[in-house]
């Protein structure tokens, strides 16, 4: 909530003082509004990709001549290059075969730190509940990791990456993280490229907690420097990246035109203009071509909830917001006449958007699932209103009361539900499961909430906001800002463990459904890096990623 400022406005017969928003303008202008697909280049890429895809399939299949370490390395490379979605079943079958052939990891090859670490991480990421006690073989009699490992940089790097898939009570992985981090930080300045770049990058952003598409773009450039690279896989990855980027640019152009036609920048100047950042967010949830419709729908929803959020946070007064909240609960265009003129604009746009969703999904007989997204929208608006009243009344709730309300205003209940709308594979049972707030969803929402609270604390404090999570915790427990932030960081770590646990088999829904939740968690780790709010202030955090993924293509 922004502080009150002298912006006079009439409401009935009385003059009111509104807040002033201080959001920076869009970084992008009209850059993405139009995109003309070069069909000749796209066709050429697609043709080459089909040939390379078949060659890559053969490379994956020709495993009998490779050692276990080479097979695992190959799968890891294919996944990091962003082309694994072409070979999902083949990769799943390979990993299943490795696991069933040696479920206790007794082969001598597993005495190699890199091999065991890669296998452990890959199996965990694919849902296998593998015990981390396997790493005991690398510890001494005192239960500490052997100092002799400190010279095995690739082994340490993969141990570090493996430690990020940890769940609750896995102390050995906590020790693995501390041990590998310390030795990698010490070694990094003395390494040669590309290994030095990989170590520095990993310490900045772990693979498991990063946005897959961001990691793909980075890894393609790193893999090109490798002496032992596979040229077929590299060329396939480059072409696939560029072809998929063309689709992403088309989608962003559609979202940008929709946003421009709404003209909120002119009619609702108090709100954030972040359509491009909204689309980037969706690429983190799913980048693959089959999710094109889903990305566009999710991007529009994020942009719309941003407008609603800013209406509560940066412009509206309580009596207006009360009517606005009630109108959204009723979800009927006839309610529009009750609203102030500026609210009519966003109210109509909101209802129109969901009507569009229903029409679009009716083509596949799925219009009924829009109901679940509407209910999440109503929920978040109710909770926004509670926060607005707290601010106006100067009320600081107990931290438990704060969190029970603020989990919804993190937007992640809404965004997770919306992420399934455009997924043809998401059925009513999946939406019902999600509506019951399963543990993995609760963890994801908590993660978003507490990391956002840490990142935005200083800014909100400067605006006069007292009902922040950090302030509430400090007041309740009589601790310093630093201690409160440490506690929230602990809550985030606990939430990550719940997310990691939630993707392990057996699962109540498909891996495809669960991956959206995992990816939403990953977006938080990237967007709020170093406690910065990358969405509100995208200049430092998101701008380089957006340029890498949506502006610059890869040189072929």
UniProtKB/Swiss-Prot annotation:
One of its GO terms (molecular function) is magnesium ion binding. InterPro entries: Isoprenoid_synthase_dom_sf, Terpene_cyclase-like_1_C, Terpene_cyclase_plant_C1, Terpene_synth_N, Terpene_synth_N_sf, Terpene_synthase-like, Terpene_synthase_metal-bd, Terpenoid_cyclase/PrenylTrfase. It is found in: Cytoplasm. Mg(2+) 2 binds at residues 309, 313. Pfam families: Terpene_synth, Terpene_synth_C. The Asp-Asp-Xaa-Xaa-Asp/Glu (DDXXD/E) motif is important for the catalytic activity, presumably through binding to Mg(2+). Induction: By infection with P.infestans. It catalyses: (2E,6E)-farnesyl diphosphate = (-)-vetispiradiene + diphosphate. Mg(2+) 1 binds at residues 309, 313. Binds 3 Mg(2+) ions per subunit. A motif (DDXXD motif) lies at residues 309-313. This is Vetispiradiene synthase 1. CDD domains: Terpene_cyclase_plant_C1. It comes from Solanum tuberosum. Belongs to the terpene synthase family. Tpsa subfamily. It comes from the Eukaryota. One of its GO terms (biological process) is diterpenoid biosynthetic process. Its main location: cytoplasm. Keywords: Cytoplasm, Lyase, Magnesium, Metal-binding. Its cofactor is Mg(2+). Its EC number is 4.2.3.21. Sesquiterpene synthase that catalyzes the formation of vetispiradiene from trans,trans-farnesyl diphosphate. The initial internal cyclization produces the monocyclic intermediate germacrene A. GO terms for cellular component: cytoplasm. Pathway: Secondary metabolite biosynthesis; terpenoid biosynthesis. Mg(2+) 3 binds at residues 452, 456, 460.
